[in-house]
A protein has these predicted regions:
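Short alpha-helical DNA-recognition segment
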Residues: 11-29
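DNA major-groove recognition helix of helix-turn-helix/homeodomain DNA-binding modules
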Residues: 40-59
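Recognition helix of helix-turn-helix/homeodomain-like DNA-binding domains
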Residues: 23-37, 68
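A short, Lys/Arg-rich alpha-helix, primarily the initiator
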Residues: 1-9, 47-48
Length: 216
């Protein structure tokens, strides 16, 4: 594992890297200079998490409408979110996994918007031939994927982590509403919800917003 190269790909300083992965700053310096080496199990785990973050953060700009691309069914033509997502699945007709807001719709935790345009997915880059599609990554662990109503989508914890990783381009209304519904349907508890350590502080702020969501 070339830590310096992976850190550079993330676009992080040593300090930013240390804070993101909850590693002492001096330790990061020592690992990069070769003064010390991380234990093998830790190196493997860290590399796995970094590469996942690189996949999740591959999208930095939302796509604009391109008349040369194919159009997907529009949300306003369907009464419910699920019927819209099924129509999208039928048009794409290849293997993919719904992510972020669309995953929350599949989970029944977010109703979506009537003017919805962006569709977040995991799958082949070839899916970008459709207007509105944003490919978060080409691969995702089957342990993070659920299936219901003939739709495949990321589970809540993966959806939450993806939201944190893509915060700079994501409207947080969906994940905030979803967490609020989860909280109040589980006896005012977030039991079962978990995030990586680097997202814990951000999650706690988001959880506060979620508990107040329907009272505002």
């Amino acid at each position: 594992m070339d830590l310096r190269e992976l850190r550079a790909q993330l676009g992080l300083t040593q300090q930013g890297f240390a804070e993101r992965y909850d590693i002492p700053f001096r330790t990061v310096q020592n690992w990069e200079t070769g003064l010390r080496r991380p234990p093998e199990y830790m190196a493997r785990l860290l590399e796995y998490r970094i590469r996942n973050d690189l996949i999740n953060c591959k999208t930095t700009v939302l796509p604009e409408y391109d008349p040369r691309k194919m159009d997907l069914p529009t949300r306003r033509d369907y009464v419910g979110a699920l019927s819209w997502l099924k129509a999208i699945r039928n048009v794409i007709s290849e293997d993919f996994v719904f992510a972020l807001d669309e995953a929350l719709m599949c989970q029944g935790l977010f109703g979506g918007r009537n003017d919805e345009y962006i569709v977040w997915v995991y799958g082949s880059d070839a899916l970008s031939r459709f207007n509105g599609i944003v490919v978060l990554g080409n691969r995702i662990s089957r342990y993070c994927v659920q299936e219901k109503n003939g739709l495949r989508f990321t589970d809540l914890n993966r959806t939450l982590s993806d939201s944190m990783a893509n915060e700079s381009i994501l409207d947080f209304q969906g994940i905030t509403e979803a967490l609020s519904r989860y909280y109040y349907s589980n006896n005012e508890s977030f039991l079962g919800v978990s995030v990586a350590p680097e997202y814990q502080e951000r999650f706690e702020r988001l959880a506060d917003d979620a508990t107040d969501y329907y009272s505002n």
